[in-house]
Amino acid sequence: MEQLLHYVWKHKIFPLKELKTTTGQQVEVIDTGLANTDAGPDFFNAKLKLDGVLWIGNIEIHERSSDWFKHGHHADTGYNSVILHIASEIDTEISRSNGERIPQIQLICPEAVRTNYKELLETDSYPPCYRIIPSLPPFTAHSWMTALQMERFEQKATLLNERLKRCQGNWEDAFFITLARNFGFGLNGDAFETWAHRLPFRAVDKHRNDLFQIEAIFFGQAGILEDSDGDGYYLRLKKEYTYLQHKFGLIPMDASLWRFLRLRPANFPHIRIAQLACLYHRAYGLLSRIMETETLQGVRDILKGGTSEYWLTHYTFGGSSPSRPKTLSNTSLDLLIINTVVTFLYAYGLHKGNRVLCARAGSFLEELKAENNYITRMWEQYGMKASNAADSQALIQLKKEYCDKKKCLYCRIGYEYLKRK
């Protein structure tokens, strides 16, 4: 329960006036310090008074005071800056590496906090804090949602930077790979990212003006042109791919990675690849164009896309279907903007120190409708309704990074739950 002690100390959930060290010194807590998530003492730069004398330094917390020795802190000069040791059980005196004794206090977690925390960890309901959500103070709910939105921005930007490294810092390539992944709309996301990493962009660019050749490379690298039989269009693509494959030394991915189960025909990989081919063909400098587009509708117009004529009457190679345009629905477009465009606006804005792009990312989310998925529906059921995409992104972050990981101690709703009497 050491984590819980950290929590009790950080939020001062203890009787401040009755705090004394094991040797009887009166303790006045001015500042509990900054929580440390890396190696070293648990809290940095705490301020407190011991019998009226001001001390500024670090705090270390353990279940038992003997853990100080168990963890080797007595021999580590990095812990000589500790001015107060906190433990729920005092079973020994402790000292710095030079032999100086360190003041200690026994901190008992309040029974109500312990009981509430146990409820959060052990309840079968999801989320476990559902009882108090309707009664959350409006300011608490609003400020927490805002913080979660920024946290999600930062998390996505970090993941994007990792992808950017794989692309040798090429933002256009990283953008298309991210866009391709999100064209998988969950089920085929991994397959689309694998496929996109197989695309030789510099080679493809040489044939960008020819949609047929782009399709040949795109479908060929997806492993979808491996069969020897097919209709006329399929065989023409296969022949073209064979030539380009030899020319550029292309190696296709394993076609078994593509998933079709429970997919509507409009979501089949064939259609999504055809749409991406058309987009790549007509939108040179795709990321640059999007960065220069100031309106949400303008971004939608760029991404809306379409397909070559063959796909108007087909969902896969072979059997035909009634003719209909294969453009992205508004819902699909908005998801691509949320998960790709907004992320790049924010990350690229940070990279270039361009606050306008960062602000545009936020305004796009506020303008877009809230996502409608099982996560947002769950929160709405318990009283947290998303009014726009910024809210829905915050609620997704809350579930994935706090509820699923049982990080109730780091959640502001968890805080409200724990401090109940």
Which positions does each model-derived feature cover?
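N-terminal "leader" segments that precede or initiate the main folded domain
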Residues: M1-H6
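Hydrophobic, aromatic-lined core segments that form the binding pocket/scaffold
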Residues: L148-A394, K407
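Short loop/turn segments at secondary-structure transitions that flank enzyme active sites
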Residues: S65-D67, E89-T92, E111-V113, F185, ...
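Cysteine-cluster motifs in flexible loop/terminal segments that predominantly coordinate metals
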Residues: Q393-K421
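N-terminal ordered "arm"
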Residues: Y7-S66
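Compact, glycine/acidic-enriched structural inserts
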Residues: N80-V82, I86-S143
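A broadly used, surface-exposed interaction patch
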Residues: D42, A46-E93, N98
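Short, structured segments at the rim of ligand-binding sites
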Residues: A39, D76, C411
